[in-house]
From Swiss-Prot:
Catalytic site: 16 (proton acceptor)
Protein name: 4-hydroxy-2-oxovalerate aldolase
EC number: 4.1.3.39
Keyword Isomerase: no
Family the UniProt entry places it in: Belongs to the 4-hydroxy-2-oxovalerate aldolase family.
MF term (GO), any: 2-isopropylmalate synthase activity
Residues annotated to bind substrate: 12-13, 166, 193, 284
CDD domains named among the record's database cross-references: DRE_TIM_HOA
Site (Transition state stabilizer): 12
A Pfam family annotated for this UniProt entry: HMGL-like
Positions with a binding annotation for Mn(2+): 13, 193, 195
Length: 343
């Protein structure tokens, strides 16, 4: 293993549990602490990326461009990054983000849809940005299929391609196999982004590092979607124990998590019943509320609905499947009850 580059995404992935309510003052304090602690890249944007502030994804308290501008003004050494999802963010938002101070853009697609990112990588390169590709929900496809998608991003200009465990569904061998496959096939760097739904955020990140990952992600206090991400301060401590500290101030990150982030958190993300179900089923956390409503309507345990959605490999945008699945399960249960009655 080698010392990785760490990107802290408290101010992006952490925007989900914060309901996108970060303020300039909060961003200033967090960026200043991360920068002083030696974190080389800090991601700042709406949880769903540039232009995510909307009725569908949740409105931001403060414009993400204002937050980016604040972050850049307080970062003396760290680079400022933003997330961009094709279909949400456009050329206009990317250009504005550059004008406000981002130096890195992370372009995210479903792990089967890298081909929709070509224009986004092209523009990012024209604008002089470092570019990172995100293959989301990467647990859903085998390593060889992910290699094909990663090669597309590499050909479009990605400087690094990430395996992203969006649902927190991977086990350590899953993370290692996917990272190893990309390392063997690509000439650019490979990264890994963990979620903690099965309690494996740190473990999966270590497995990815053992497989050769060059870049990893974390959030202070684990503040991220679902059960949260690998905690930045924990990653720093573990890397230091392994002799792989890339220049991080372990105590400084512990203090930032404890005294700056913890007091503003609406709750502590952890693997509760709902989060575990998301990781176990391997589906997006956005399905959870819809599954609960459908379960109540049709008398089905929402966990059964989510597991079936995972079996069918439903992805974001296919929320309409939830009612169909609930109906199917209800009919099967009804048929089973009738058989018992006639038996």
């Amino acid at each position: 293993m080698k010392a990785p580059r760490l990107t802290d995404t408290t101010l992006r992935d952490g925007s989900h549990p914060m309901r996108h309510q970060f303020t300039r003052e909060q961003v200033a304090k967090i960026v200043q602490a991360l920068d002083r602690a030696g974190v080389p890249v800090i991601e700042v944007s709406h949880g769903d990326g540039l232009a995510g502030s909307s009725l569908q994804y949740g409105f931001s308290h403060t414009s993400e461009f204002d937050l980016i501008e604040t972050a850049r003004s307080y970062a003396e050494r760290a680079k400022i990054a933003a997330l961009m999802l094709p279909g949400i963010g456009t050329r206009q938002e990317l250009k504005e983000a550059v004008a406000r101070g981002i130096q890195v853009v992370r372009i995210a697609t479903q792990c089967t849809e890298a081909d929709i990112s070509e224009q986004h990588f092209g523009l990012a390169k024209e604008l002089g940005l470092e570019t990172v590709g995100f293959l989301m929900m990467a647990h859903m496809r085998p390593p060889e299929a992910l290699v094909e998608q990663a090669k597309l991003m590499e050909s479009y200009g990605a400087d690094c391609v990430y395996i992203v465990d969006s649902a927190g569904a991977m086990l350590p061998h899953d993370a290692a196999a996917r990272v190893r496959a990309l390392k063997e096939a690509l000439s650019v760097q490979v990264g890994f982004h963990a979620h903690n739904n099965l309690g494996l955020g740190i473990g999966n990140t270590l497995a990815a590092l053992e497989a050769g990952a060059d870049q990893i992600d974390g959030c202070l206090r684990g503040l991220g979607a679902g059960a949260g991400n690998a905690a930045t301060e924990l990653l720093a401590a573990v890397l230091d124990r392994l002799g792989l500290n890339p220049g991080l101030d372990v105590f400084g990150l512990m203090d930032a998590a404890e005294y700056i982030v913890a007091p503003i958190m609406p709750f502590q993300p952890f693997p509760d019943r709902d989060a575990i179900t998301i990781g176990y089923a391997g589906v997006y956390s956005t399905f959870l509320l819809h599954a609960k409503r459908a379960g109540e309507q049709y008398g089905i345990d929402p966990r059964e609905i989510l597991v079936e959605l995972g079996r069918r490999q439903a992805v974001a945008g296919q929320e309409d499947w939830i009612i169909d699945v609930a109906l199917d399960l209800s009919r099967r249960r009804g048929a089973g009850t009738r058989k018992e009655a006639h038996g």
